[in-house]
Regions:
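Short amphipathic alpha-helical recognition elements used for nucleic-acid or partner binding
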Residues: 27-61, 81, 205-206, 210-211
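Conserved amphipathic alpha-helical interaction elements at protein-protein interfaces in regulatory
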Residues: 45-46, 63, 87, 239
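Intrinsically disordered, charged and Pro/Gly-enriched terminal/linker segments
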Residues: 30, 66-68, 75, 90-91, ...
Length: 259
């Protein structure tokens, strides 16, 4: 059995689903209350931090709750998590996936396969190989962007407790798209255009993506589309932030027009 298959698999990018070591996906109805899912997702999101006290978790997840209802909801949700992810655990045995020390809680990462962790590892390996072996770098970066199916925890888009992690993952994914597009620019400008377009679907204000797209169109001999790309970049930046493109982008436009 592969390492991934023997672990609890958690998918957070563009979806939220959990696959048990038995290969079966945990159904939505099995989780019961939404607060059970919220607590598990919170523990996933904060897994790289130190263990958090129960009161800290409650105040971040359900700030509107009083102490009594918060304690009750936490207890019910934690019981629900253990019941769903370790259905065969006896009541007296220690939980495999959640480390509890007194009133602090943390996920046991060594027993989990999490797509966003794998994405980050592949991006790091791609960046490490960038200068010595661009071919290997491209392989890792392609694997990473293929794993990125969409926003981190898309069903919690308005939850403050996962906003920072969502933005962090998006930024490193955008950087991976840009690096790949740069690697492809000279040999396959059409692929650079595709990659930069994918980056702009994640964030249509990402100026690096417009710039690479301009360069790629210019290399293909399509100056009108290169200029049109600049105009779109300028329009988006003005609308969203009230700013103009960077000097490097303006200079690229001047160079393209002069050819």
């Amino acid at each position: 059995m592969s390492e991934k298959a023997s672990q609890l698999q958690v998918y957070t990018l563009g979806q939220f689903s959990v696959v048990g070591p038995d290969g079966n996906t945990i159904k939505s109805k099995d989780w019961g209350r939404d607060k059970t899912i919220q607590l598990f997702q919170f523990l996933i999101t904060t897994r790289h931090q130190r263990a958090l006290h129960k009161e800290q978790i409650i105040s971040r997840l359900w700030p509107e709750s009083d102490q009594k209802s918060g304690d009750r909801d936490f207890k019910v949700a934690m019981h629900g998590i253990n019941k769903v992810i370790e259905p065969n655990k006896s009541s007296r045995s220690e939980a495999k996936y959640i480390i509890r020390q007194g009133l602090t809680y943390q996920l046991a990462g060594e027993h989990l396969w999490i797509d966003s962790d794998v994405l980050e590892v592949w991006i790091a390996k791609g960046n490490q190989a960038l200068h010595n072996d661009p071919k290997v770098a491209k392989e890792y970066l392609y694997k990473a962007i293929e794993l990125h199916k969409g926003n981190y925890l898309p069903n919690r888009l308005f939850a403050d407790w996962c906003a920072e992690e969502r933005e962090r993952i998006q930024v490193i994914t955008l950087a991976a798209y840009i690096t790949l597009a740069e690697l492809c620019l000279e040999v396959n400008p059409a692929e650079s255009i595709r990659l930069s377009q994918q980056a702009l679907l994640l964030d249509d204000t990402w100026e690096d993506a417009y710039r690479i797209q301009m360069e790629a169109y210019a290399l293909k001999g399509n100056r009108p589309l290169a200029i049109k790309t600049y105009q779109k970049c300028k329009k988006v930046l003005e609308k969203e932030f009230g700013i103009e493109p960077l000097p490097i982008t303006k200079n690229l436009l001047t160079t393209i027009k002069s050819k």
